[in-house]
Amino acid sequence: MDSTIWTIGHSTHPLETFLALLARYQVEAVADVRRFPGSRRQPQYAQEPLRSALAEQGIGYHWIEALGGRRRPRPDSPNIAWRNTSFRGYADYIAGKEFADGLNELLEVAGRRGTSMMCAEAVWWRCHRALIADVLCVRGIKVVHIMDETHAVVHPYTSPARIAQGRLSYVATEGEPLAGKRRCPLQTRQARTADNNDSSV
């Protein structure tokens, strides 16, 4: 597969601007990671109009519901490094089979065509795309966030992200921090071994 997966937020962009961004970064497939793929305020990004507009540009569309956000944290959540409850809920969700299945679907799409994850939020650090990016980077996949036509950034890991025995963790007492110390993608021997032997994160 292409060793890079992109991310983008449709925000309030006119559809033409959004399509131009995809073209600028040579995106060939969009993986929609919105849990609910519709928008009353931005109807051009509802699922069917978006699918049609992308198809006209030769861009594939894939809704991966299993990667959608808006997950509630468990009462016994160990991921207290995330003070934001929405992100803590998603960190809990990452440990489950449904997320693993969704991630495998994303990797399958990205294995065929240059792919960008898409959600509504303009900036990645306010979106669950950030946590998906953490997972991908630990697995040795480069993630790049599209900001505008001239600015795209390699994922820098979220501040709560840690590496413990080659695995991603958001438990504050486990392992060592990734943010500011490791680059995406993580290329440790432990990370590659975990990726080869275990489909969970």
What kind of feature is each model-predicted range?
Residues 1-201:
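Residues lining hydrophobic/aromatic ligand-binding pockets adjacent to catalytic sites
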